[in-house]
């Protein structure tokens, strides 16, 4: 499989800081036993798997608004 880059992921996630949060949350899920959403025949590390999932559009996000007090 081709090398995944941050630019590939930024096509799916507009903000690089949001990308870091999304990838780290997905890595935690994978470490806790979640199944990869893509083929991982090369036994890549969870960080690479999470970035490939984001770049392929398998992992997304939803922004929620906070209520002001």
UniProtKB/Swiss-Prot annotation:
* Recorded GO CC terms: DNA-directed RNA polymerase complex
One Gene Ontology BP term is:
DNA-templated transcription
Q: What InterPro entries does the record tag this protein with? A: DNA-dir_RNA_pol_omega, Pol_omega/Rpo6/RPB6, RPB6/omega-like_sf
Q: What class of enzyme is it?
A: transferase
Q: Name one GO molecular function term.
A: DNA binding
Keyword terms: DNA-directed RNA polymerase, Nucleotidyltransferase, Transcription, Transferase
Reaction(s) catalysed by this chain, per the record, are:
RNA(n) + a ribonucleoside 5'-triphosphate = RNA(n+1) + diphosphate
Pfam families (UniProt xref): RNA_pol_Rpb6
Q: Which residues form a coiled coil?
A: none
Q: What is its EC number?
A: 2.7.7.6
**Assembly:** The RNAP catalytic core consists of 2 alpha, 1 beta, 1 beta' and 1 omega subunit. When a sigma factor is associated with the core the holoenzyme is formed, which can initiate transcription.
The record's listing under PANTHER family reads:
DNA-DIRECTED RNA POLYMERASE SUBUNIT OMEGA (PTHR34476:SF1)
Main function: Promotes RNA polymerase assembly. Latches the N- and C-terminal regions of the beta' subunit thereby facilitating its interaction with the beta and alpha subunits.
Q: Record's NCBIfam families? A: rpoZ (TIGR00690)
Q: Describe the family membership recorded for this protein in Swiss-Prot or TrEMBL.
A: Belongs to the RNA polymerase subunit omega family.
Name the UniProt record assigns to this protein: DNA-directed RNA polymerase subunit omega
Species name? Geobacter metallireducens (strain ATCC 53774 / DSM 7210 / GS-15)
């Amino acid at each position: 499989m081709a090398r995944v880059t941050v630019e590939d992921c930024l096509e799916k996630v507009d903000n690089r800081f949001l990308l870091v949060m999304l990838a780290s949350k997905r890595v935690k899920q994978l470490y806790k036993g979640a199944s990869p959403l893509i083929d991982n025949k090369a036994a890549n590390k969870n960080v690479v798997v999470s970035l490939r999932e984001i770049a392929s559009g398998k992992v997304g996000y939803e922004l929620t608004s906070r209520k002001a007090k």
